[in-house]
Each structure stands twice: as structure tokens, then as C-alpha cells.
Amino acid sequence: KKVPTLRGRTIINLFFEPSTRTRTSFEIAGKRLSADVINISGAASSTVKGESLIDTVRNLEAMNPDILVVRHNCSGAPALVTQFVNRPVINAGDGTHEHPSQSLLDLLTIREHKGDLKGLKVAIVGDIAHSRVARSNIHAMQTMGMTVKVIAPPPLIPIGIEELGVEVCHDLAKGIKDADVIMILRIQLERQNQGLLSSLREYSNYFCLTEKHLSNVSDDTLIIHPGPVNRGIEISLDVMEGPRSLILNQVTNGVAIRMALFYLLLGESDANSN
């Protein structure tokens, strides 16, 4: 349902990486709040002509938008943008660093099905080394009192990650045995240095989540995945489409979370000014 909360406001989605779920949900979120939403891709911006990111956002700010949503392949890019514009900036994913709104929608999805988050055990499986989703969720989940375990072959585990307070495991079956929630991450081939994995087939032989694995976990263990999904590599088709899977619920909740972010950053200021 469309509401007039942000009528007259302008949101710019500035995405320097491909995106289906995140970009579209930010757009839908803005439009459902009646904001004017402008989408700009890196390929359609003047950065392809040599313009810097800073010059790009300063020029956009000169057009008086109310908020910038930034996704960039470089870690720290949205934080850098905040130093040069006097507008709210939402990090929609920056390199291998963070993806804050994804962790919020993941927590909302889990809470809808588990209630209180405190004490829940979460197993994060997959390409931990290159995953901004893993980093944001480790921080968010621990803040909410959840216990986090990361499961992957050694080359995909960041050195020193134990210092974040997580348990490290290299065996999928053992690692998920006591999990309340299993978060599967895709292998991010676009971010990997060559040679970390011998082959995707070998990875899937040991770390693809299947119904056989789920036969050894609790009946109410939940499966989530931030997408996009590489079917048959990190998760089997039957698990993805099975009753435990909340993958599409996550997508639905992404719109609600991003509407809430826009409202908190823009809507409340309108209410206070009135």
C-alpha cells in the first residue's frame, strides 16, 4: 500500500555494482512512501568518462536530493561519500566490508519465525572471506545475543576472524548440527583471487547444503540466503524450495526494512517540523 509519508522527497539510488534485490527493494520502498526515486548505475554515470566518485556525488548533491543510497565495489566508499555531502547516505553494500540493511532484514525474518533472538545459534556457511553480508550479520547477531559459527574451507575463512567472537568449523555436517538458523552464502567468484578453490564441483561436494545434512538437525531449523543463489553449488534445489527455506521471506522483508530506514532518516524530520 502506498502512503504519502515522503511525498516531495527525492531519493537517489547510486549503484556501481549489479543488483536485483537490493536496488529494486530500495526503489519500491521509496515509491511506496511516495518519494521520487532516481536510479543511477555506474555504467550510466560519468565515472565511465573518468569522473571521480566524489565529484559524482557532489554534483548529485547540487541537485538537492534528500538522501543517497550507495552501493560500490570498494570497501568504505559510502563512508567516504558522507565526508563530502551534507545528506543522509545509506550503505547498500560496499566491497567486502558491510551490508547493513541486509543484516536488518535477516534479523527481522528470523524474529518473525523464532521470536526472541537472544540465545539462538546461527551457522553461516560459505564464502566468509569475501562476504559483506557475513560481516554485517556477525556484528548484528552478536549485538542481539546470538551465537555465530562460520563454516567454510580454510581458504574462505578470514585470518583472525575468531577475534570477532565466532567459532570456526571446516565440516558442514558437524557445524550445523546444533544450529537454529543456517545462513548460506554464495561463492563470490567476482571478488576472489584465483586459486582459492580447486573447483566449484569440489566445493559443492563438501559444502552444498542438502536434505541429507538437514536430517541431522532440528525440525525447526531455518534456512536463509541473501541471494543471488547458485543452485546446486551452495544449496540444493530441494532445500531451497523446501519448507525450512525463508529466502523469499527475506526478499519481502527487504522492502519493509528499507521503508523503515527512509522513514527514520526523512519521515520523522517531516513530522517534527510540522
Predicted regions and their residues:
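Phosphate-coordination loops involved in phosphoryl transfer and adenosine-cofactor binding
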Residues: 6-11, 118-122, 220
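Phosphate/diphosphate ligand-binding glycine-rich loop within oxidoreductases
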Residues: 6-111, 231
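Glycine-rich phosphate/diphosphate-binding loop of Rossmann-like nucleotide-binding domains
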Residues: 16-29, 112-185
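A short helix->loop->beta-strand "cap" motif at the edges of active sites that frequently abuts
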Residues: 87, 145-147, 216-222
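Short hydrophobic/aromatic-enriched beta-strand-loop microsegments
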Residues: 88-93, 168, 246-249
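Rossmann-like adenosine-cofactor binding region
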Residues: 161-238
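Adenosine-phosphate binding glycine-rich loop
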Residues: 220-221, 226-274
